[in-house]
Amino acid sequence: MEIILRKEYSKFINYWLITLLSFIGIIVVVGGLTRLTDSGLSITTWDVVSGILPPLTDKQWEQYFNLYKEIPQFYLLNQNMSMSEFKVIYYWEYIHRILGRILGLFFLMPLVFIYIKKIFNKKYNLNFFILFLLILLQGFIGWYMVKSGLVENTTVSHYRLAIHLNLALILFSAIFWFFLNINSKSN
């Protein structure tokens, strides 16, 4: 029988995988609420590092609001939007993006530990590395989706949205499969 992981780390791995599954579920729900509140286009830039912090001053809020005013969603649908209304939609998108970043870090940091401690066999190491690449791809697809609504449309491309959601479901399914597989092999 093939050994997938070192037995002494099985509890740690189970907690990690369950937390990842929960996190993906939360991100999908927040993403759905972002979509339902038409908030997805409120952040018109993709600042992977500097976008970690939301606007903190009135001047920064004005800058972000002015960027939003340049896209069709604002000037065709939301011309009368106030700053306080903009902040609401901004925070929905911001929370969705920050949760994605946290998920990426929460996946990567234990993965580095897993590689250092050689917890998984080589096959599973490769599988989890591929999952990490898919998480990075998910962030890029999210931006690719948002970008589709910044120029000519007032919403994002439904096709890109479907790709974004389906990749989240693929990630969830793969992690759940690993969880089940690891636990069935360890019994």
Question: Could you say what each language-model-derived stretch is?
Answer:
Residues 15-52:
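N-terminal signal-anchor transmembrane alpha helix
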Residues 103-109, 165-182:
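Hydrophobic cores of alpha-helical transmembrane segments in multi-pass inner/ER membrane proteins
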Residues 67-107:
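Individual transmembrane alpha-helix segments
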Residues 12-17, 122-132:
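Membrane-interfacial loop-to-transmembrane alpha-helix junctions, especially the N-terminal start
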Residues 7-10, 115-126, 184-187:
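Membrane-interface helix-boundary motifs at transmembrane edges
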Residues 152-164:
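Non-cytosolic membrane-interface motifs at loop->transmembrane helix junctions
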Residues 49-72:
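Long, glycine/tryptophan/cysteine-rich extracytoplasmic
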Residues 29-35, 136-153, 184:
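C-terminal ends of transmembrane alpha-helices
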